[in-house]
Amino acid sequence: MAVDPYKSGQFKKNPYFAKSDLVGRLVVTLTTTYETRGLQMIAQPSRCICEKQIHELILTDEEGVACGSTVNRIAYVGFVEITEGGVITNGDAVYYNDQLLGHIAGFDETHMPNHYNIVLYAPERKTGEDLGLVPGGRIVIRQVKA
């Protein structure tokens, strides 16, 4: 049986040398926060996301979120429809138009196969409404080189 290289700790450094941006458009703006949401980050730091899929963006101000951790303090940002698919990874920057929303902290599969919860970290926890996001805005997820 094959072993998951992330779960078994086989990767000693980030294997993603270079990758294309993932592009989408915001289709829903959300406006709710929770203090005890209990999102469970999966063990893997990456997801392959296909064109035409719709996924949810959620923001947390909890520091130290990692694969396998639980996230409680969240703000709902919105749903994005993917127009150019790709591979997204923890640490990638997420932009609305040219505004940095945060960096990917992990992925929760609560609602799969319907959609992923893509959890972003930012120092301030704000909803999509708080951030002034409007459906139709461009979402770009871009690799951050160390």
Which residues make up each language-model segment?
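Short, basic/aromatic beta-hairpin or loop at an interaction surface
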Residues: 60-77, 115
